[in-house]
Amino acid sequence: MSKRQSFYQFLMTERNPDSTDEIAQFANNAFYDQSFPKQADDYDSLSQYLELNGTYLPSMVIFDNAWTKYEEFMS
């Protein structure tokens, strides 16, 4: 069985510097966040990190939408 992909690894597949899509912009900004928890794959730790440090994320709804896509991708 393969190892579960981290949320960050998934999020990097959504990067697109030319896109105005909110998830793409989140991914672009997370790429430059050197403290982003790159190995995390659980909602609570990522949510807590972003609430405290994700000044580049205008709304936690964007994270929630990205998390839903991540869960769909992982299932």
Swiss-Prot record:
NCBIfam families named in the record: PRK13672.1
Gene3D superfamilies: YozE SAM-like (1.10.150.260)
UniProt record similarity statement: Belongs to the UPF0346 family.
Name the UniProt record assigns to this protein: UPF0346 protein LSL_0716
Pfam families attached to this UniProt entry: YozE_SAM_like
HAMAP family: UPF0346
